[in-house]
């Protein structure tokens, strides 16, 4: 399964804000306890608000079956974002990429 994980600017931490505002994503192939990094994707939409941003992210992160981040959408019920992303998502309490990969069941990473 191809997974996109929201990264902080340092590339090691998990972005603490909404998934769509992350500066970049680590894309991994997760299979049978092994996780292989495929690429890092810069987010050109990080500063955009509302509109069709979820669809733009879906196109940016083509082929991902799961998005992992600290938050999805905004807590404000009047915010213009869609209530849920167009790809299945998983909230994480992980603070680092390594912790998030462990939550996904990764026994080994490459």
Regions found by a protein language model. Give the residues of each.
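Mid-chain, well-packed structural core segment of small domains
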Residues: 57-88
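Non-catalytic interface/targeting segments
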Residues: 1-52, 63, 88-110
